[in-house]
Amino acid sequence: MDIPIIKLLVEKDSISKKYYCPDCGELLINNFNPEKFKALQCKNGHTKCLQCWEQHLKLRKNCLQCKVPVSSIKDLSLNLYIAQKISANKVYCKNRYYETKNFTIDEENGCKEIIRVDEYEKHIKECPLTYTDCKNYDDFIRANPQIDEKLLKRCGKINKSLLDEHDEQCLYQTITCEHCNELINRIDHEIHLSEWCSDIPIKCEDCKHVFKKKYIQEHKESNCPESVIDCVYVAGGCQKKLKRYNMSKHLVTANHHSQYMSKIIEEQNQDIKELHNFIENHLSKKFIDLDTIVNIQKYLIKNKNQKISQLTEIIKRVDNSFIGLHEFDELEDYISNTIDIISNFDNYKNSNSNNNNNNKNTNENENTNENTNENENIDIVGNSDNENNINENKAENNINSFIKEQIELIKIKSQQFDINSVIEEIRKNYNVEPYQVNGDNAMITSPNKTDVDNLVFDDDEDDFDLEEPQIVGEFIFNKSQETIAIPTLIRQQQQQQQQQQQQQQQQQQQPPPTPLPPQNTTITNDIQMENINENINNNINENNNNNNKNNDDDNITAATATNNSNTTSTHTILNGTNNEASMTDINETTSTTTTAETTEATASESTEESNNTAETTTTTTTTTTTITTAAETVNSTETITLRTSEKVEEKGKDGLETTESFSILNSTENSTISSLKVLSNSMIEPEITTDKENETNIKESIETKIIESIVESSSPTKSLLKQGKEQEQKNQNGNGNENENENENENENENENENENENANANVNEKENEKENSNINTSNDTEPTNDILEDIKKNKENEDSNESEDNKNNNIKSVEDTNNNNNNNNNNNNNNNNNNNNNNNNNNNNNNNENVYDIKKDRNRENVEDSNDNNSKNENGKINDNGDVKMGSEDKVNDDDDKMAMVDRSNTIFRNQILFKDFTKLNARHGVGVSIKHNHTIGKYKFYSELFINGETENEKDYLSFYLNKCKKENESIIISFGIELLNVDPKKSIRVYWDNELLNNSSQVMYNYGYGETTVIKKSILEDPNNGFLVDNCFIVNLEVYKIIDVPHPPPAHLLQKSSPPAATTTTTTSSSSSKTTPKTKR
């Protein structure tokens, strides 16, 4: 229908020019399509073809000739006259032409009819000579899309009258095979017969019979009589070839076939045996592999069950401690109530202070009516009461300031409390990655999901593929879709309060352990040491001048506290602007610790014992003090390390070990309260001594006070110790009141006191001898004092030799008078002291069983490594019946290691299973000294393990070596207990190695080793043999377990440790009391 009419007109010249378009020159109607068969004109009769009108109206809305407005085609009218004239013309049928592009005429098969233009459409529908495309070609292309059309030849246009003839010859026509009746295309017929058709008849080349193609091969191999074949016994050695129909004759005539038959039978029997052996070996290996797989699966199932049980327990604990948003209001009420209770402490304090003042006034009024001797005693007690009142007020002020600070902190926390801070605090405490919070339920979930049982490590990389769940405290935090509830803050506060109460009780019952020396310490100059000696001499001279006046006041400052094991005393003193002010402060705040011999004695002996306690003081320790003298106005930041002898390792006959430490404590607000309670328990009671003893006691007190002033001036715990002394003075005030009441009854008991004084004077010589013996014994049991104390004693002896006999006699008389008045008090005080001594003995016996970390012990262990040999490894690395290997770090270090408790391996805080795949590949790739590293994170600590397949050095190249190292972090040291387990198919044969209480350190100041492990875990020959059960499918598994981690304060530099520690502390071997062993080379 798209063919132009002008192309098919029979008489083109007969049409007038008025039927052509004036714009394009074509016929006004030039299309057979009925919709386009029309000529359009404007109102004035100007006619154009349809295409010209459409193009013109796009540009202008008017007629091109008369300019009449024309908005669209609808405004134009049809010119029916022109349509009738054009439709009356004659045209040819389009089927006259073979193709309409060039209008090539098909004179043989083309349509010869001539028709009118208006009849053309009807004729085309009925014309029998229409040309079409070949359908067979289209069907062939659809059935074989893989064939490229460019390689094929199309059939072209075909006249409808010739379609039948074309199908008989068309190559793409579908036909049926005459042999197998299979449908094929005519173009594939020849290939089908030659290669594909199985039913095509083929003649046998030997017998000339015809068989189908699918049977011809079988015919030749088994049935064809003319085929040439080998003898049946060709395997036995017969090389005869003949036609099949002659084979029977050959078998009958030949006699050597029996030999061939026997040979064939033997070969077959041998083949059968080999096959049988192969099957047995293969099945045995399969059974062994199955057993190993089953045992490993059982072991993994057991571990899963343990993990499931742990998770169930944790879920129960978490459910019990779940908190919702509705409990936050209760928490705010709780905080407000605590604030009110603490704020009411001021009223209670004021009421108590008023009562104390009233009691003191009444006591003073009553004392004015006593006799002259009593008045003197009352004046002494009154002066001590005034001093105690001052100290009490200072202590109360310190407590009030502390309480106010706590109130402000609680108010700030209550104002800033919200759910986000609670979640953030829990995340920091348990070292958990950020989690998502789901709305009002306040539940924490993690976004990631991992499978712990599929834990596999890559031998080429340091990092592992999946993370093992980490056990931190009571919770397991794993990157999996598990829900963890938030514990209530109220329950946490209750637990913290209980822990603080337990710590306070322990501190009251036993002395705190000696803290480690501070990190930054330096040695003072000789000028400072000379200043100390000058101050000592000046203070001694001043006291000699005021000796007769202030004997009683100076002797009050001595307090006794006995310990059978370790006695630690902390001395503090405030510096004044001049010597007199400093001496008054010394008399107010001094607290010295003395050790008295506790022996069976009567009441009279106890009085003499109290008089001589100042002489029997033996304080021998490793002291660390900060020097600042009273005369200096500038505070010195340098510190002095007092040189002492080696640590006490041998106990005396009485089992006494005394230790005094001028220590710098690091304490928090909680520790300040507990320390105040501990110091308040030690009651300061006045003691009256003889005149000679009084002078020596005064000198010793002055010496200790000067050392205390050195400590107090720059110690970071100055305020803490000052509060403790003020609390002691407050407690002493109560004792002074008791002494007043006792003095009122002295007149009634005058005769009894005289008798007791006579007995006491009779036993003076015996008591002095006993005290000299006790001094000798205690000096043997303890360490010798430092150089400064030795110089002080020398000065004291010189002063004693210069004293006159007159002063001694006067002092003796004054002491006798005071003894007559205070015998009853001394008896009571000594009885109390004996009870305190017994309590201290019990506490110290308990303290001996506790574990105390000693940094010198770890330094000894580090130096052991270089002196050990392979024999010591084998001794310490023995395997127990349970497969455990206990390493040398658990051997005792002298007698102090009896205090080290064995770690409880049931409380494992971290377990990680490492799978090492393809052992042969690892063995070939990692040579001597080349390790496989894996990172591990346990809470806030980061470690990495190292496995040396071929040993760390040439000496251990035949062994497997394993180490656990701490990732480098400055100024951080820990004590760790851990173990490894090399899994075996038989769990009883698994190798377990563990290390207890090992020090891991990464400091740039101190050259400590940073890893622990074992150089000879297992021989490679044992591991490489798969029959031993360690290798399964060329893989082995190592379990890493961590039992505890303890933070350790950072040690001082090595050059100070060498000066402060005794020479005997640098031994390179460690021995135990039961057996002598050397520590193996387990640390690098």
From Swiss-Prot:
Residue stretches of biased makeup (Basic and acidic residues): 644-656, 790-799, 853-864, 875-892
Biased composition (Acidic residues): 739-757
Pfam families, A to Z: MATH_2 (PF22486), zf-TRAF (PF02176)
Residue stretches in coiled coil: 265-321, 489-553, 735-852
Compositionally biased region (Polar residues): 571-586, 774-785
Primary location: cytoplasm
Domain MATH per the UniProt entry, residue ranges: 909-1042
Signal peptide region: none
Keyword Chaperone: no
Annotated Gene Ontology cellular component terms: cytoplasm
UniProt-listed InterPro entries: MATH/TRAF_dom, Mucin_signaling_protection, TRAF-like, Znf_RING/FYVE/PHD, Znf_TRAF
Domain annotation LIM zinc-binding: ranges: 19-103
Location(s) in or outside the cell: Cytoplasm
Compositional bias segments (type: Low complexity): 349-375, 492-509, 537-549, 556-570, 587-637, 809-849, 1059-1084
Region (Disordered) location: 348-392, 490-523, 537-656, 709-897, 1056-1084
Keyword Repeat: yes
Keywords on record: Coiled coil, Cytoplasm, LIM domain, Metal-binding, Repeat, Zinc, Zinc-finger
Cited function: Probable adapter protein and signal transducer that links members of the tumor necrosis factor receptor family to different signaling pathways by association with the receptor cytoplasmic domain and kinases.
Domain free text: The MATH/TRAF domain binds to receptor cytoplasmic domains.
Similarity section: Belongs to the TNF receptor-associated factor family.
Protein name, as recorded: TNF receptor-associated factor family protein DDB_G0272098
Source organism of this protein record: Dictyostelium discoideum
